[in-house]
Swiss-Prot record:
Pathway: Amino-acid biosynthesis; L-arginine biosynthesis; N(2)-acetyl-L-ornithine from L-glutamate: step 2/4. Its EC number is 2.7.2.8. SUPFAM superfamilies: Carbamate kinase-like. HAMAP family: ArgB. Signal peptide: none annotated. It catalyses: N-acetyl-L-glutamate + ATP = N-acetyl-L-glutamyl 5-phosphate + ADP. It comes from Lactococcus lactis subsp. lactis (strain IL1403) (Streptococcus lactis). Keywords: Amino-acid biosynthesis, Arginine biosynthesis, ATP-binding, Cytoplasm, Kinase, Nucleotide-binding, Transferase. It is an enzyme of class 2 (transferase). Catalyzes the ATP-dependent phosphorylation of N-acetyl-L-glutamate. The lineage of its organism: Bacteria, Bacillati, Bacillota, Bacilli, Lactobacillales. This is Acetylglutamate kinase. One of its GO terms (molecular function) is acetylglutamate kinase activity. One of its GO terms (cellular component) is cytoplasm.
Length: 283
């Protein structure tokens, strides 16, 4: 009886959050180890289906996880890096698209349908969703995002399906470009003026002195975040994610959250409880 009462109390407390996010857009960037562990993946997808069921416009943007590396290895395509970015020739760009849009994207759509929901998978090249140009001559087909055309997402959001977006870009010349998935997701969130952008990663969130748990930051604004970056208290691994979030917030994004995707039902705990789960970044 007590467990039932606790469940009822939790649902009652969550009501204000159901109302807050109903008919609002929440963009979720999915990647990292959360894509590898099947139990974690199923937990995340179940959470996404619940969000959709209570009237939230969920947009799922994903990277390639290990799938791109595995396909490149299969075709004996060696990777070279310049300043941390993969040099991408035309063949590598095509293989990356195959892994992203062919394997990972359709697998996620299949899993969502298997769990009782509906999903439509597209890549960034469909409808020129993610428009890009070469970031530099040295990196060949590595793309810099120049524009987001979200109309295809908005049309899907008018249905019962979750839009599942593979983060590839296309140029006005029709060439395919490899784009950073975190940047793509944040730019999509900004273009949609999303209420919330959730970036799933492999850490709990931001720390003032990583990995000291006592220094965990549960909420921070852009001004104080800039101070932490200048003081070099944010790990190098997090800097690209922070830069992507900042850009999206200037574009129209409401809030962003860095969240550990490995925690069971982290999405529900973040969106529907007072305490939250990760680090919230606001204006």
């Amino acid at each position: 009886m007590r467990d039932s009462q606790n469940t009822a109390q939790t649902l009652t407390e969550s009501l204000k959050y159901f109302l807050k996010y109903r008919d609002q857009t929440v963009v979720i960037k999915y990647g990292g180890n959360a894509m590898i562990d099947e139990k974690v993946k199923e937990s995340i997808l179940k959470d996404i289906l619940l969000l959709k069921t209570v009237g939230i416009k969920v947009v799922l943007v994903h990277g390639g996880g290990p799938a791109i590396g595995e396909l490149l290895e299969k075709y004996e395509q060696k990777s070279q890096f310049v300043q941390g970015l993969r040099v991408t020739d035309k063949k590598t760009a095509q293989l990356a698209l195959t892994a992203l849009a062919g394997k990972v994207n359709k697998s996620l759509v299949q899993d969502i349908i298997r769990l009782g929901g509906n999903a439509i998978g597209v890549s960034g090249i469909d409808g020129k969703l993610i428009e890009a140009k070469p970031i530099s001559e040295d990196l060949d087909y590595v793309g810099e995002i120049t524009a987001i055309h979200p109309e295809i997402i908005e049309r899907i959001n008018q249905t019962d399906a979750v839009p599942v977006i593979a983060s590839a870009g296309i140029g006005l010349d029709g060439e395919i470009y490899n784009v950073n998935a975190d940047t793509a997701a944040s730019r999509i969130a900004g273009a949609l003026s999303a209420e919330q952008f959730i970036l799933l990663s492999d850490v709990r969130g931001l720390y003032g002195n990583f990995p000291d748990e006592e220094s965990f930051i549960d909420e921070i604004n852009l001004t104080n975040l800039e101070k932490l970056v200048k003081e070099k208290k944010i790990t190098d691994r997090m800097i690209p994610k922070i830069e992507a979030i900042k850009y999206a917030m200037f574009e129209g994004l409401g809030q962003a959250v860095l969240l550990d995707g490995r925690v069971p039902h982290a999405l529900l705990l973040e969106l529907f409880t007072d305490k939250g789960q990760g680090t919230m970044i606001n204006h």
